């Protein structure tokens, strides 16, 4: 990736940023500030859908738009040069010998571009970050340096367009909404405060302000300010602005520009740079609740000392977001994990919107995003997420379906992004998986007895009837009840082959056109696994003696009944209909106690039933290998096929049959062989999501209308590839699992091909370009796979257990490898030594020590951890030797 990593903290350098103009980097903070920035300083800045500071930027805006952050240098002869590379002259030199080089350096979570005017020998380094401390602001630190032997005289000007309204207004009254603008020019810069928030359903008075402020390194303000975009560009453009080129007069300070598109253009005093001399300019861009709050930000942040301290504070804050550190035989792998480890936090901030590729939706995360991102957070601070996990169950409806969009606060839910009635059939799976991981990490089995509300929005009968429930009633239940409800209703929603109905989609959102006859073999297998996990959790709860039964609505007796033919398709459907009808008709205060052992036995029976159906109906055997059919389409026909010359295969079904325990030991090697033969493409990042399917068959979903190799139709989709790795590791196939994740991060780090910064994207396009970077659930699964399966550091009801599956090439030259992480509120450094070159299946822990004291079986009990010092890093050493046959 150009020059590669600069240290062991993930900081990196790319030599030719000008060749990656569409590459963007996130700048954000947990206070809600979200930004993106490119090597040309394009991108946007916002707080939410209705509060964009800079104009909204999609991928195409990065390519063709001119709007963005800019910093001009006007030399004595009138020549203009842009520190962003965005002047007419610089653009005209692209792809010629005179093209300007742009170096990009970045780290957690700061971004720097370095450009040099070779004629003038003037270098500009622009460092950008969003402070981790209070203040809804982005800071742009510009450092000019005279690298030549002659004195330079120049006039610097910062110029940043202020959009100041909703993204909706890009194509909805763009000009009309500009008439609401009121921009005040001040010595600090420009404050824009629109009079109203425009919405034809009801306009509301606006208080929110947007601003651009700036100072020199010696605390001086701009000598001229321009707030009117028309006056700034004149008869020029954003890449040749008349106000800068002609040094036109500034606005009257304290004056107001009304009804115009706004820019924060700040001209600083002419300066003289002697050879070797540097000069710093600091620009603040952001938003505040009102004008007074904006003025307060200026008072606090327009300080050279405060700004410089902020950069170091921000680096430290992001460094601590991901406390996991690895040391293997590959420093590139160790460094990219620093970036992958912060991706769940980035998705918590951005949701699934607000980066250039993610130009859909209006913020918020989806249901499964909520639970999967929590998996990543469980690795760093499991003790702090319990309240959030309980609150998340407030999105479950009484019929076992759920809200699909999550608001900004835990427990805040919306039915759907676009107000559409949709049911994703996989949604009941993820909470069980996450709660299982939480209990294993913490030993907090009593979370199952905590109480959460149910989501009520009028939808009933599994989302098929609107306004089915006329009046909201106060309904609550335990976490165990919520999970049991999701599992049992899913089991009863049977398709004609006995698999679970696909409904409006599963994990693959693009399988959205088979609501009548579609079935998901993939998530039938997943639910078989999650039912077994829930049964294990309830059995553990029973064995603690805390309770022998749980309180449930009386209607649960329908779902738990085991009358003759209880598992038949007809019986399952009839039960579901009766249950959902009673959800509407019968008050929830009619409750009964149901023994835990009865529930556990029933869940195991349901899991066994689903496994038997999958094994009987979904296995595809060929002469060379075999795999499981993942889906039935809306014709009721299998999507996959093993006929020679017509073979069709999808990865999703293989992941969940392995992970859910459906695939047997003899079938897993066959599945892997088939996946290597039909799906593997190393140059594209590893295992594709599917082979070519029938592009004319729209009886499964929109995915088949996508060009093959893109997104859900045949791309290397990181999320499922990483889950494939996790599934293989979980069943003891370490080398096979590593082969699924290694090509992903290798390609991601090859910036000439992937065109992205470190981290893993949602998928790779056919040419290897990483698409939709940063905001992907694959990051949490990658960290889970590395920590729990590769390094084998996992929880078992609160105990720390070591079960490593590291490959011999992952050890350093001393045959050692290590990981630093938190567990049980304590910090550990776990060091493995491989005594001879062995595969994971050949070695075991022959000796282990905690702080130089022996521990048995590589296991530290919760009682032992309780006595450990919270302030130190505890050293666990384990020696790996050959298993005794």
PLM region spans:
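Short, glycine/acidic-rich hinge or "gate" loops at secondary-structure transitions
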Residues: 173, 293-296, 405, 445-455, ...
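Conserved H-X4-D acyltransferase segment
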Residues: 142, 366-380, 653-662, 728
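Aromatic-rich carbohydrate-recognition surfaces in CAZymes
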Residues: 72-75, 370, 377-385, 389-496, ...
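Extended glycan-interaction surfaces of carbohydrate-active proteins
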Residues: 320-362, 389-410, 479-514, 551-716, ...
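Acidic/histidine-rich catalytic neighborhood
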Residues: 171-175, 185-190, 448-474, 555-586, ...
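Alpha-helix capping and helix-loop boundary segments enriched in small/acidic/polar residues
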Residues: 129-133, 361-365, 380, 415-426, ...
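Beta-rich accessory regions
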Residues: 133-157, 212-233, 275-280, 287, ...
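Anionic coordination/interaction segments
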Residues: 1-371, 382-395, 422, 427, ...
């Amino acid at each position: 990736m150009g020059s590669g990593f600069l240290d062991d903290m993930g900081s990196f350098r790319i030599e030719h940023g000008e060749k990656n103009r569409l590459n963007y980097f996130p700048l954000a903070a947990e206070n809600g500030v979200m930004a993106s920035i490119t090597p040309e300083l394009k991108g946007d800045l916002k707080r939410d859908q209705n509060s964009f500071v800079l104009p909204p930027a999609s991928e195409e805006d990065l390519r063709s738009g001119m709007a963005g952050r800019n910093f001009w240098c006007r030399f004595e002869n009138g020549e203009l040069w842009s520190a962003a590379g965005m002047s007419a002259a610089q653009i005209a030199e692209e792809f010629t010998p005179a093209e300007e080089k742009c170096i990009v350096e970045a780290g957690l979570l700061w971004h720097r571009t370095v450009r040099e005017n070779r004629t003038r020998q003037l270098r500009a380094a622009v460092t950008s970050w969003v402070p981790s401390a209070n203040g809804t602001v982005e800071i742009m630190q510009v450092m000019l340096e005279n690298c030549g032997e002659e004195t330079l005289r120049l006039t610097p000007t910062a110029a940043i367009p202020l959009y100041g309204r909703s993204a909706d207004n890009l194509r909805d009254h763009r000009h009309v909404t500009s008439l609401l603008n009121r921009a005040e020019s001040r010595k600090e810069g420009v404050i824009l405060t629109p009079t109203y928030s425009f919405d034809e359903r009801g306009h509301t008075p606006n208080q929110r302000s947007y601003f651009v402020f700036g100072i020199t390194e010696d605390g001086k303000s701009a000598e001229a300010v321009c707030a009117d975009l028309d006056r700034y560009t004149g008869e020029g453009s954003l890449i040749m602005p008349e106000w800068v080129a002609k040094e036109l007069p500034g606005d009257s300070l304290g004056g107001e520009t009304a009804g115009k598109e706004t820019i924060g253009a700040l001209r600083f005093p002419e300066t003289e740079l002697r050879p070797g001399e540097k000069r710093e300019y600091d620009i603040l861009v952001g938003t505040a609740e009102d004008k007074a709050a904006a003025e307060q930000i200026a008072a606090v942040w327009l300080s050279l000392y405060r700004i410089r301290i902020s950069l170091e504070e921000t680096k430290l804050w992001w460094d601590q977001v991901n406390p996991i550190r690895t040391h293997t035989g590959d420093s590139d792998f160790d460094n990219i994990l620093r970036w992958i480890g912060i991706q769940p936090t980035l998705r918590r901030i951005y949701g699934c919107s607000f980066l250039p590729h993610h130009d859909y939706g209006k913020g918020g995360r989806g249901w499964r995003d909520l639970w999967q991102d929590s998996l990543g957070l469980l690795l760093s601070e499991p003790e702090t997420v319990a309240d959030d996990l309980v609150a998340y169950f407030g999105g479950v409806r009484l019929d076992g379906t759920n809200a699909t969009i999550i608001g900004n606060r835990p427990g805040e839910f919306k039915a759907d992004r676009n107000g559409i009635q949709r049911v994703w059939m996989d949604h009941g799976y993820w909470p069980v998986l996450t709660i299982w991981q939480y209990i294993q990490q913490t030993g907090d089995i009593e979370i199952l007895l905590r109480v959460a509300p149910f989501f009520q929005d009028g939808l009933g009968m599994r989302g098929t009837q609107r306004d089915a429930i006329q009046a909201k009633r106060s309904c609550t239940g335990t976490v165990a009840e919520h999970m049991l409800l999701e599992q049992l209703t899913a089991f009863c929603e049977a398709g004609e082959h006995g698999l679970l109905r696909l409904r409006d989609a599963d994990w693959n959102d693009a399988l959205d056109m088979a609501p009548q006859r579609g079935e998901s073999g993939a998530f039938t297998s997943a639910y078989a696994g999650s039912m077994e996990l829930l049964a294990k959790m309830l059995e553990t709860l029973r064995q603690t003696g805390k309770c022998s039964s749980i309180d449930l609505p009386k209607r649960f007796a329908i779902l738990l009944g085991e009358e003759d033919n209880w598992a038949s398709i007809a019986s399952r459907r009839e039960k579901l209909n009766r249950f959902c009808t009673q959800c509407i008709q019968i008050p929830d205060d009619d409750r009964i106690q149901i023994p835990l052992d009865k529930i556990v036995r029933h869940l195991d029976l349901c899991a066994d039933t689903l496994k038997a159906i999958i094994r009987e109906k979904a296995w595809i055997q060929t002469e060379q290998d075999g795999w499981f059919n993942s889906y039935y389409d809306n014709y009721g026909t299998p999507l996959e096929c093993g006929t020679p010359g017509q073979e069709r295969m999808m990865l999703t079904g293989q992941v969940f049959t392995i992970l859910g325990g459906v695939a047997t030991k003899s079938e897993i090697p066959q599945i892997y062989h088939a996946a290597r033969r039909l799906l593997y493409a190393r140059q594209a990042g590893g295992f594709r999501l599917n082979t070519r399917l029938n592009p004319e068959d729209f009886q499964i979903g929109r995915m088949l209308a996508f060009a093959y190799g893109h997104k859900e139709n045949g791309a290397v989709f990181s999320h499922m590839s990483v889950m494939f790795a996790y599934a293989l590791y979980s069943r003891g196939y370490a080398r096979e699992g590593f082969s699924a994740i290694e090509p992903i991060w290798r390609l991601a780090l090859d910036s000439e091909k992937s065109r992205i910064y470190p981290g893993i994207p949602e998928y790779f396009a056919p040419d290897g370009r990483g698409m939709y970077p940063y905001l992907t659930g694959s990051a949490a699964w990658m960290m889970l796979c590395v920590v729990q399966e590769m390094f084998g550091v996992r929880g078992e009801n609160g105990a720390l257990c070591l079960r490593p599956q590291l490959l011999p090439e992952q050890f350093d030259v001393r045959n050692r490898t290590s990981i630093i992480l938190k567990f049980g509120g304590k910090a550990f450094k776990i060091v493995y030594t491989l005594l001879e070159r062995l595969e994971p299946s050949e070695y075991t822990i022959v000796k282990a020590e905690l702080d130089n004291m022996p521990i048995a079986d590589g296991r530290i009990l919760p009682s032992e951890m309780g006595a450990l010092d919270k302030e130190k890093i505890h050293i666990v050493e384990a020696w790996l030797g050959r298993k005794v046959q």
